[in-house]
Amino acid sequence: MRELKNTCRAAIVQATPVMFDKARSLEKALRLMDEAARNDAELIVFPELFLPGYPYGMTFGFTVGSRKADGRQDWKSYYDNSLLSDGPEMQQLIDRAAALGVYLSMGYSERDAVTGTLYNSNMMIAPDGRAMNHRKLKPTGSERVVWGDAQQDYFPVMDTPWGPMASLICWESYMPLARVALYQKGISLYISPNTNDNPEW
C-alpha cells in the first residue's frame, strides 16, 4: 500500500478576476500561481468561476417571459470569455502547474465546443499534466439562466500524494448524495470552491 503524505500546504486564492476578460484574468491567475508556489504551496485552489469571473448581481436582461437586448449583449460577452475545457487557456494552466510542480483547482465558466452550452466547472490539474473536469450538476437558482445542467464530467477523483482529491462547486456541498458520491470514492481532499462570503461558508 502506498504511503500518503500527512500534510498538504494549500494556497486558497481570495482574489478578484478581471471581470469578463479571460485573457487578463488568466494572466492574473498565472501570477498568483507563481506567488503561491514561491511560498511553497503544493495545492493552489481558486474560487468558483474565477475565469472569467462570477457575474454576481447581473440579470443578463432576463425576466420571466422576456429578455432585453442589452442583457443579450452581456451574455454574449460572458459567453465569448468562457473557456473550452481543452482550449489554449486551460493548456497554459496545465503547463504552469507542471512547471511549478503543483496541484491546481481552477473554477471557470466552460463553453462546450459541440453544444455551445456554458457550464459552471472546476478543473483539477496535476503537475504531471493530468486534468479532470467537474461540471456543476445543477446550477443554483437564477444561475440556470447562464449555465446548463451537467450531463457528463461530474465526480472525477484525482490521485494525489495525500490521497484521492475531488470537488463540488458551491451549493453542491449542501447536497448530501453528492457528498456521499465522493465519500464512496474514498476521497481524502474535498475542494468546495465558492464565490461569496455568506455566513454559511
Predicted segment positions?
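Charged active-site motifs of nucleotide-sugar-dependent glycosyltransferases
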Residues: 8-9, 43, 103, 164, ...
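N-terminal active-site segment of His-dependent metallophosphoesterases
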Residues: 1-43
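Cys-nucleophile CN-hydrolase/nitrilase-fold catalytic domain and related Cys-dependent amidase chemistry
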Residues: 22, 34-127, 197-201
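Active-site catalytic loop in hydrolytic enzyme cores
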Residues: 3, 84-85, 89-98, 110-189, ...
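Short, basic, glycine/proline-bearing loop/turn elements
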Residues: 13-20, 72-82, 161-165, 189-195
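Acidic active-site catalytic centers that drive phospho-/nucleotidyl reactions
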Residues: 14, 48, 172
